[in-house]
Amino acid sequence: MNAKDYFNNTASTWDKKFLTPRLFSFLEKLVPQFGLKTGQNVLDVGTGTGVLIPHLVKELGPEGSVTAIDFSENMVQECQTKHSHLQNVTVKLGNIEEEQFPEETFDAVICFGVFPHLQNKQKALQNIHFTLKQEGKLVIAHALSSEELKHHHQKVSTQVAHDMIPKMAGMKKLLKLTGFTEISIKDEPGCYLCVASKFIRV
């Protein structure tokens, strides 16, 4: 049993358990901090049931688009059912550690609540960097601090007990290694927000 099994097993009850008024309010305040612009093309990695999608659509407007992927078949099914009415949202099965989108496809790539569950984080970041446009942004975010998240995963299931965010120095090193610049990390109770940019070609 692994993280994928955990998410497949919990997909049908995920929103009831985790999509609380607090989380909705948190996302309403968090997503505007991503720096997204109307009309942009955004990749939502590890979308789950799509908790981020309504907030992304609000920021991007009708001219923007969201491609949402998840490695859990059951999560994708839940997400497709919830958001089938949105014309500018595409939901599909995908793993960013393996998925190779075309070069310079997206203005921003968002990883909300997923980064600790990536087994090969360096490969995932390389793929994200490749598919980002020049000056594109990577956002890694959680509704808990890295320390709170570690304890949360240890508590909820043995399948995700070892899934955690690298320490700040390690995260910065990993991002620089995969070509990211302008790295900022906020890690405080109730919020983790990492924003980085793709190297600007001169």
Model-identified regions with their sequence ranges:
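Conserved class I S-adenosyl-L-methionine
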Residues: M1-L36, V51-H55, M75-E78, K82, V139-H162, ...
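Class I SAM-dependent methyltransferase SAM/SAH-binding core
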Residues: L43, T49-E98
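A short acidic, Gly/Pro-enriched loop at the edge of an enzyme's catalytic core
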Residues: E97-A108
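A short SAM/SAH-binding and catalytic strip from SAM-dependent methyltransferases
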Residues: A108-N120
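Short alpha-helix
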Residues: D163-T178
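Core SAM-dependent methyltransferase catalytic element
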Residues: G179-T181, K186-V202
